[in-house]
Amino acid sequence: MAVQQKIRIKLKSYDHSLVDKWAVKIIDVVKQTDAIIFGPIPLPTKSHVYTVNRSPHVDKKSREQFSFSSHKRLIEIMNPTGKTIDMLMKLELPSGVDVEIKS
């Protein structure tokens, strides 16, 4: 039985529409090379909340909360070819999307 190669691409951003848009673009590029694709798989959204004092030295009871969420998607590519990898390397992702690639 042959060992299957796979590439896992994790996209992470604070804007969910940006992550979804680029996940679709990556899938379209990979479909042109006849590789098998699983995804985009939505991973859990992490919400971060920061609480700060409104005043620099008085009124400890007066606070303000700031929150933001980080959205993640996973794309798995099975049996990638050299052409698949070349096309993925040519993609120019925006600065708002963090990409992590594992093989």
UniProtKB/Swiss-Prot annotation:
GO CC annotations, alphabetized: ribonucleoprotein complex; ribosome
Keyword terms: Ribonucleoprotein, Ribosomal protein
Keyword Ribosomal protein attached: yes
Signal peptide limits: none
GO annotation terms (biological process): translation
Listed InterPro entries: Ribosomal_uS10, Ribosomal_uS10_CS, Ribosomal_uS10_dom, Ribosomal_uS10_dom_sf
GO molecular function: structural constituent of ribosome; tRNA binding
Function, in words: Involved in the binding of tRNA to the ribosomes.
Similarity annotation: Belongs to the universal ribosomal protein uS10 family.
Quaternary context: Part of the 30S ribosomal subunit.
Protein name, entry field: Small ribosomal subunit protein uS10
Origin species: Prosthecochloris aestuarii (strain DSM 271 / SK 413)
